[in-house]
Amino acid sequence: MLVVESLALGIDRFKSLIVEKVKEILHEKGIDIRGVYERSDAKVRTLEGMERVKGIIGDEFDTNVEIVENGVHYMIDVVNGQKTGFFLDQKYNRLAMQKLCKDKRVLDCFTHMGTFALNAGIAGAKEVTGLDISEYAVEQARANAKLNGLENTVHFKCANVLDELPKLNEAGEKYDVVILDPPAFTKSREATKNAIKGYREINMKCEHEQLAR
């Protein structure tokens, strides 16, 4: 399956050509895709006067897909997941996490579909807790934990991280590894100061004398 996203008018004009060329290149490498799904539904498209588009390009096909990355299995929801369904740019960061988590107690903040948490679990972490404000993302994460046989080690909770961290501190919880991968707090220059304040607040709440040990 090929999932595409176009956020700029210049790219949008050549979208069909780009998709066909990508399919040709993949075919030459022995990779034949079963279908193309477009996730050009980001709000930012409206800034260039473009409609938000989402759906299958071409013939109908099954959009459910299972992938394996760094030894971890995931069921990907390209229809309802964030952006194109999976953050491929974090592949090597997730792999690096595996080297830090064996026999450790891990807290994964802003876990989304649990990718960092699951990498910690597959690497032999003693206990992993993932936090995310999205109930849908947490449901996905739990399903992927079960898919990997990690449901007894890797647990997920639907919670606002900024609210949950003080509660964990008050309860005296301590973690060997704390993962912070927050979403973008701003997409414009005007909100930069508030974004910096938010990032600082998150890191302050995870100071070594509090959550991390």
Task: For the regions a language model picked out, list residue spans one by one.
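Structural motif
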Residues: 5-9
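Non-catalytic substrate-recognition/targeting regions of SAM-dependent transferases
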Residues: 14-86
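Rossmann-like S-adenosyl-L-methionine
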Residues: 54-213
